Amino acid sequence: MKTVTMRVTGLVQGVGFRWTTQMIAQELGITGTVKNNPDGSVSIVAQGDELPLEHFIKKIKASPSVAAHVDHVDLKIIPNTEKFTRFSVVY
């Protein structure tokens, strides 16, 4: 089990990015959260087995929403301090 945080910049708010991210996470068995930030970026905490997590990260970098455009993903591996049971959108 591995946990990463991602800060995604670009056109990622108001375009279905969080909803699509949640759908992809659920398809891959990834748990965690996704939320909008005041600066226009999106923050993701994703937790899962290594291979599904790698697929999830690739899909995020490729912009999961048709209307979105990802400019940059700041990715960090963090300690598994919290165990998520599902993937949810934080409002």
From Swiss-Prot:
The active site is at residues 18, 36. It holds the Pfam family Acylphosphatase. InterPro entries: Acylphosphatase, Acylphosphatase-like_dom, Acylphosphatase-like_dom_sf, Acylphosphatase_CS. It catalyses: an acyl phosphate + H2O = a carboxylate + phosphate + H(+). One of its GO terms (molecular function) is acylphosphatase activity. PANTHER family: ACYLPHOSPHATASE (PTHR47268:SF4). Belongs to the acylphosphatase family. This is Acylphosphatase. It comes from Lactobacillus johnsonii (strain CNCM I-12250 / La1 / NCC 533). The lineage of its organism: Bacteria, Bacillati, Bacillota, Bacilli, Lactobacillales.
